[in-house]
Amino acid sequence: MRPYLLLKNFPVWLSIRTMSDSSVSRQPQAIRVGPSSPKYRTTPDQALTRMPPGVPYIIGNEGAERFSFYGMRSILIVFMTTYLMNASGQLATMAKNEAAGWFHTFVSAVYFLPIFGALISDGLLGKYRTIIYLSIVYCFGHLALAMNDTRLGLFLGLGLIALGSGGIKPCVSAHVGDQFGQGNSHLLPRVFGWFYFSINFGSFISTYLCPILLNDPRFGPRYAFGLPGLLMLIATVVFWMGRKKFVHIQPGGLGFVREFFSREGLEALGRLAIVYVFVAVFWSLWDQSAGGEWTLQAKSLDLHFLGLTFLPEQVQIANPILILLFIPLFNYVLYPAIDRVFPLNALRKIGIGLFVMASSFVVIWWIQSQIDAGGKPSVGWQLLAYVLLTASEAMVSITGLEFSYTQAPRKMKSMVMAAWLFTVSLGNAFTGALNFLIPALRQHGFNLEGAAYFQFFTWLMLVTAVIFVFVARFYRGKTYIQGEASMDAAAAS
C-alpha cells in the first residue's frame, strides 16, 4: 500500500531531510505552544548516538493513523453502494460509477492537499503544530462518518479526513528526519524499518477487521467507521504525549517560496513534470485496486481460495503483504540479475513498471469479461493481478520517489514531495471524472461499463508506457546531494 506510501518509501528522503535541516544555520530558540509550556529542543543533539527519544511516539502515531485511514478506505466504496441512507433512514445507495467517482475524488483531494500542508508546516506553524491541529480535524472527519450514514455525514466526513490526512502527509516523515543529528544518523535505516513496518501492519490489520465489522449485522457501518476513528484519536494522543521528547524544527517563514520560483527551482520542476505526467496515469490505475473498482469486482467472484474465504473488501490485503516481500526481492535479487543483462537506471525501472501495471489490468479485464458472461471466476485470478500490480508499484512508486528527491534542489525537498503526491491526485481526478461521465458517454454511444471499462484503462496504460520509453531517452536532469555541489547527470544515473 501507499502508506505509503507514500510514507513507506522514504529511506532516501528521511536521510536527505535530516541532512537538509542540519545544513541550514539556525540559532536554537524555544518554541512555546502556550504561556506555561516548557521549552522544546529546536535542533538535534549532534552528540547523541542512541535512538532519539521521540521516535517511538512517531512510530506509534503513524501505525495508528494508517490503521484509521486504510480501514476507512477499505470499506468506503462498499458503504456507498450498499449501506448509504437518506435523511428518513431509508436506503439511498449510489450506483457503482457514482460511488467510484466520489471515491477517486476523495483520494484525489487527499493527495492534493499535501501542497498546503507543506506550505503551512514549512512557512508558518512548523511540523509538530501542523500535525496536531490537522489530526484533530482528521478525528472529527471519522466521527462524522461513524455518526451519520447519510450523504451529509459522508461528504462532511470525507472532506475533513482529506484535509487532515492530506495536510499531515508531507510533515510526518520530515519530522522523523528532524530528530536525528550527525551522531545517530546511522540509525535512520533501522528507524525507517520500524516506521515502514508500523504502516503496513496498521493497514493490514484494519483492512482485515473493518470489513468484518461492516458485514456483521451486530455492528454495521457505525462500528466499522468508528474503529478507525478511535485509532486516529489514539494516534493523536500518542503524538501529543511525545511533544517534550521531540526536536521541534522551527518554520523558516515564506522565504522558501523564493527558491520555488527561482530559475533553478522552476527548471527542476519542469524536468520532473515530464516524468510526473506518466506517473499520474499509473496512479489512475493503481488506486482502483485499493478499495475501489477491484473491490466492487470482488463482490462477483468466488471468494473461496486455497481453503480460505475472503470478504470482497479483504482481497486487497494481498498488496501490503506482497510489497513487504517484493522490496527486498527486487533490491537484492531481481534488479542485480536484470542489471547484468540490461543496465537498469531509475527511468528504465519506471518504464518496466508501467508495462507490468498494464499486464495486471489485462487480468482484471479478462476477469470482468467472464463476469459479464455470467461466470463466477475464482478470486485467485484477482490475487494474480495483485501480484503484478504490486510488482509495478515496487518499480514505479519507490523508484520514482527516490528519483524525485535526488532531482530536487536542496531547499525544495518538501515541495517536491508535495509535487510527487500531486501525481496521485491528478490520476484519481481523471478516474473520478471519467466515472461521473459514464452515463453521459453511454447516451452518445460510448460504453465504458463492465469489461469495457478495464479494457480502456489497459490500453491507456500500454500507450502511456510506450510513449514514456521514448520520452525518457531524452530526459536530462541534475542530481542534488545534500552537502555537495549539484551534479549534472543523466536522469538514469
Protein language model features and the residues they cover:
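Intracellular juxtamembrane helix-capping segments at the cytosolic ends
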Residues: 167-182, 395-408
